[in-house]
Amino acid sequence: MRDPEFWHNKWAANQIGFHLEDVNPLLIRFWSDLAPKRSEKVLVPLCGKSEDLIWLANQHDSVQGVELSQIAVRSFFAEHFYTPTVTRLNAQHELYQFDELTLFTGDFFTAPVESVDLVYDRAALVALPEEMRTEYAQRVLQLLKPGGRILLVSMDYVQTELSGPPFSVPEAEIRTLFMGCEVRRVYQDTSIDPHLNKRTQAGLSRFAEEVWVIEKSE
């Protein structure tokens, strides 16, 4: 992944304002829109130490996550008093396994992830600059089985008003990135995101948090 030091430094300095302490209510509300089955395998790209992993593991037999930072993954298991089995796969990746959870550390684009039926993306696409997002979408679709579904949470604002991350990913770009898939917006909230500080909010002329259901063709 390009500029990995940016994220390594964020975790090392505990500058993780993007981390939610609780399960994302949008996940709880909209996951059922994917018509998920317990046996279907789930992928969470750029998962951090998200509480969403726990929620998903209670719904599914296999949840894979990929996270660049070892600090994040080790913190996740330590904070939940889990003792994972750790395997060094190669110079770039480690594998952490505990019950339904399988987490890889290292670059998402090269991690040896198994193909999956479902993808949950709350903080991956919006964490990437525009020049990386096409490659990211291609990688996700490569890992997604035919007929697989994605629940995507995105943000839409005037990019020149905020440097990001999180970055703005407007509707037109999402439809282009996932061209050939069925793309449906199932939610749009135009109130300012409570995770943005007041100074940032004051500089935005508009803001929308959006949820998308994306289905890969059979």
From Swiss-Prot:
GO terms for molecular function: thiopurine S-methyltransferase activity. Belongs to the class I-like SAM-binding methyltransferase superfamily. TPMT family. It catalyses: S-adenosyl-L-methionine + a thiopurine = S-adenosyl-L-homocysteine + a thiopurine S-methylether. The lineage of its organism: Bacteria, Pseudomonadati, Pseudomonadota, Gammaproteobacteria, Vibrionales. The keyword Methyltransferase applies. InterPro entries: SAM-dependent_MTases_sf, Thiopur_S-MeTfrase_Se/Te_detox, Thiopurine_S-MeTrfase, TPMT. Its EC number is 2.1.1.67. This is Thiopurine S-methyltransferase. One of its GO terms (cellular component) is cytoplasm. SUPFAM superfamilies: S-adenosyl-L-methionine-dependent methyltransferases. One of its GO terms (biological process) is response to metal ion. Keywords: Cytoplasm, Methyltransferase, S-adenosyl-L-methionine, Transferase. It is found in: Cytoplasm. S-adenosyl-L-methionine binds at W11, L46, E67, R122. It comes from the Bacteria.
